[in-house]
Amino acid sequence: MAYFVYCIECEDGSIYTGITTDVARRFEEHAMGKGGHYTRAHKVKRVVHAESRTTRSEALKREAEIKSWKKEKKLVFISASRARHKKGVK
């Protein structure tokens, strides 16, 4: 089973990072107020990044890495990731 590390942009401009096995389902849970405490307080806007990992352990390590970054680094990472995705490069 694949695990995904995802980043959601919230309406206040903040970035929430989490892991799941189903990004679309998890986003809907956040949008309905059934996600984490953070997204109950910060309304979600859109998924801005998702990447897969083979194991839950790998996903948790990557989630922790991204969460440790300052907002500016997250925004640069997301922008570069989206640019690569548009070009079809992973």
Regions found by a protein language model. Name each.
Residues M1-R40, V44-R53, S57-F77, S81-K90:
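GIY-YIG nuclease catalytic motif and its immediate N-terminal context
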